[in-house]
Design a protein with these regions (language model features):
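Phosphate-coordinating catalytic segments in nucleotide- and nucleic-acid-processing enzymes
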Residues: 18, 40, 44-296, 344, ...
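RecA-like P-loop NTPase motor core
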Residues: 81, 110-113, 318-325, 337-390
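Loop/turn-to-beta-strand initiation segments
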Residues: 293, 325-330
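Conserved hydrophobic alpha-helix in the ABC-type ATPase nucleotide-binding domain
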Residues: 312-317
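H-loop/switch region of ABC-family ATPase nucleotide-binding domains
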Residues: 332-334
Length: 390
């Protein structure tokens, strides 16, 4: 389980939350939902970068930690003099206090049990890829929208077959010859993606992207590029440098003859190691190279969708999250249909968060089991009676 604390960021006075496999946050517009979603996404990415490089030096330097958050997630004007963020998982703990310009970091005992994830932020503006036919020719800032567009480009080019979109009777595919997106509607008519309904223009980018991640990318190693190969080389050196002195026995002199062990030279020192220990190190490297799961941060999955379709989206998200291949999901929503569809599912590891005004400032609260049961059993409308929660 992850623990996230945010103080004095944008409209938020405080958020102190435990994150589970599935997390849903509700609240009025401009109340801090996206601040929480973006910060949780950012901290998950920071954790990944620290694990893959085995150092927090970049984020500890100057104001890099907050600068990267502000740049990537478009939070200019949200950072305050006393902004504070802390994050803790099974692998590490880090925090940044803007009042003292202090970044603190500690490894946890499970440091080397980390498994690589694909961290993805799906913005509410995802329909831009349909609304702007030549979006790939437009220069965008290097932020979460541009990052999603890059991921969309990879996903669409990999979807050259007809992909059924939920249970809508709609098929999507990418035409490599014309470099365009095609959608076959329920009545058999094929349209350019830019000419489809607003609902499909919001749904298809999310659906195709997440389908690609869950079906294609999970289980793949990131060594197909120069960057990926360099990362693997660097990680191999980091792991061998760290574990060889722990697993191996330093060789003082070469006694000759046959050995049951293998001698490795690490940083000018020779270590005699069992093959089983070498396998342990190679397994750790594999955990860092091969994508194990996805950490999905999703804004407004309900955008422009009819209520029954919203429920179908939740069914699909849950199947992808709690099925044979687990993923982590964090959703920000304004829709009671999205919320109720999540709450209908019993025995899933879910946290429901909501924003609330306290002493003139916004705070984040976690709904109690009683709150959740009341919403589900008695039809309490959490969106109109949010002040009754907690």
């Amino acid at each position: 389980m992850k623990h996230l604390v945010i103080r004095n960021l944008g409209p938020l006075k405080e958020a102190d939350i435990e994150l589970k496999r599935i997390n849903v946050i509700i609240g009025p517009q401009s109340s801090g939902k996206s601040c929480v979603l973006k910060t949780a996404c950012y901290c998950t990415w920071v954790e990944k970068r620290i694990e893959l490089t085995q150092t927090a030096d970049f984020f500890a330097k100057g104001n890099n930690f907050l600068n990267e958050l502000e740049r990537f997630h478009k939070l200019k004007g949200y950072i305050k003099d006393d902004t504070f963020i802390s994050y803790e998982s099974d692998y590490m703990m880090f925090s940044y206090d803007n009042a003292t310009k202090t970044f603190l970091f500690n490894w946890k005992n499970d440091r080397w049990k980390y498994r690589r994830s694909k961290v993805t932020y799906i913005p509410a503006e995802r329909n831009l890829v349909a609304a702007i036919p030549n979006w790939f020719e437009v220069k965008f800032a290097d932020d979460n929208i541009r990052d999603f567009m890059a991921d969309w480009e990879t996903a669409r080019q990999s979807t050259t077959h007809n992909l059924p979109v939920l249970n809508l009777g709609v098929l999507y595919h990418y035409d490599a010859n014309t470099k365009s997106d095609k959608v076959q509607t329920a009545d058999g008519v094929t349209l350019d993606f830019t000419n489809t309904s607003s609902g499909l223009q919001s749904l298809i980018p999310m659906f195709v992207h997440l389908n690609y991640l869950s079906v294609v990318q999970v289980g793949k190693s990131d060594n197909s590029s120069v960057t990926g190969n360099k990362e693997k080389i660097d990680l191999t050196k980091l792991v061998y440098d760290y574990f060889s002195p722990l697993f191996g026995e330093k060789v003082i002199e070469d006694i000759g003859g046959k050995r049951s062990s293998v001698v490795l030279e690490i940083n000018g020192e020779a270590y005699s190691m069992q093959r089983s220990d070498i396998k342990k190190m190679d397994d750790i490297i594999s955990q860092y190279i091969v994508t194990d799961h996805c950490d999905i941060f999703l804004e407004e999955p309900e955008a422009n969708l009819f209520p029954p379709t919203q429920s179908s989206v939740v069914e699909w998200l849950l199947a992808m999250t709690t099925g044979e291949q687990y993923n982590n999901l964090f959703v920000a929503t304004h829709s009671p249909y999205i919320l109720n569809s999540f709450l209908e599912k019993k025995n899933i590891p879910m946290t429901l968060l909501y924003t609330r005004m306290s002493e003139g400032q916004m705070v984040i609260r976690t709904a109690t089991e009683e709150d959740i049961q009341g919403i589900y059993d008695f039809g309490v409308d959490a969106f109109f009676n949010i002040e009754s929660l907690g």
